[in-house]
Amino acid sequence: MLQNKSSEENFPQSSVPLPAQQSFADFPPVGINSLALYTPGFYLDLTELAQARGVDPNKYTIGIGQDQQAVAPSNQDIVTMGAAAGLKALYFADSADASDTGHTNIGLLVVGTESGVDASKASALFIHDLIGLGPWCRSIEIKEACYGGTAGLMTAVDYVHTHPGKKALVIASDIARYGLNTPGEVTQGAGAVAMVISENPRILALEPQSTVYSRSIGDFWRPVYTDMALARGKYSTEEYINFFHRVWKQYKNETGRSVKDFAAICFHLPYTKMGMKAFRGVLDNDISDSKSADNNNNKTGASADSDISAHTHGHFLKETLEKRYQASTLYSRQIGNIYTGSLYLSLLSLLDHDSSLSSGDRLGLFSYGSGAVGEFFSGILQDGYSHALHRSHTQTLLHRRHKVSVAEYEKIFNDAIPYQAEDVQTDQVHRDPWNPFILDRVEGQERIYRRL
């Protein structure tokens, strides 16, 4: 394995401005028009898992910040989960656009995943068929670890910008598996998040400025002969933090923005404490710098009052951003790690749980995919965005799940589709009645899907 040692890069001082004739101000805003979640109808209580593994439950629930973990039976994979989320995202978008009930405006379907079901055929094509999209549609799959969902989103935004009147469906779908009784077992999970990307979006208009950083490292990988990932956990956490600090510093250089310009920042969350590990240092440094700048600008006059004002504002800002970070983790605490969808699960959780956000607020998003790619970008909440959310639907999805015992979870885990050339009938006992799609069987080395 190649191990590249990092070196200090010289950050460019500014990005090249767009020519006037190509200014983004000349085009309609593009972004997230609808947002939908699917996660399997079964979950494991991590306190019970900790007890079965002889571990203090606080290590799971407090130490890494996880309470429950989604469990996917063999009849559910990234295709069935992605189709369920995608169908809901289309329905949510159609509820506000009676002109496109046939989805004819969807010109691009892109699936970001690191749990692909075929080395040749894109999972997007299976999903395209299951949800009934028309044939005049580009359907592709993108892979770069947990960054794949963001790669799909950026591809979709570019597509919509260059195809006026068209929309794109982006699906981030994954099953995180590390093995029974392994260090990574507590950070497993399963689910899919789907987004319709359009002009004049109802939820979040993405801003053109983003900063992306790539470097080949060996923090996490999954060989093609297994569905279980391998990781250097401590090293991966260090690089996650390092990548965030790098892209944040570069983003600040390019835009002149700091944390005070954001109402909230959402993170990719392999586990819910991880984002705060990266955020805390930046938060403290930026607020400290902001206080110093405010104090320097108020050297004359009532400097004591200025000091108090700067301190009070800095404390309030930090408290607000930390509170909103916690709101962004609530769904992840109940579902676990869904790889490509984790950042967008964080976004959905924030929007569903924090009613103090307002239209016009700027949200920051940090995407990280091991191997590794990191990107920081932002978006502006749109007027009436809360009416485009479906919080009660998502809450019902989570509340109606069935809790499985540790023994039942282990049986389901071991029942996964094998990486062998054999016919397999999938689990017919653990069916989610709320997902109309299942993987029925593997026959002649082909996956056979069915709509119930």
What are these regions (language model features)?
Residues 37-38, 112-118, 144-149, 172-177, ...:
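Acidic, glycine-rich active-site loops and adjacent beta-strand->loop/helix elements
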Residues 2-75, 182-242, 377-452:
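Condensing-enzyme catalytic core mediating Claisen C-C bond formation in acyl metabolism
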Residues 5-16, 95-102, 287-309:
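Intrinsically disordered, low-complexity terminal tails and inter-domain linkers enriched
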Residues 56-80, 114-167, 173, 285-294, ...:
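Conserved catalytic cysteine-centered active-site region
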Residues 32, 77-150, 257-283:
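Conserved beta-ketoacyl condensing-enzyme motif
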Residues 237-254, 260-284, 331-332, 336:
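A conserved active-site cap/scaffold subdomain adjacent to cofactor or substrate pockets
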Residues 56, 78-94, 123, 239-255, ...:
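Short, well-ordered amphipathic alpha-helical segments that serve as non-catalytic structural scaffolds
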Residues 348-398:
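Catalytic phosphate/nucleotide-handling subdomain of diverse soluble enzymes
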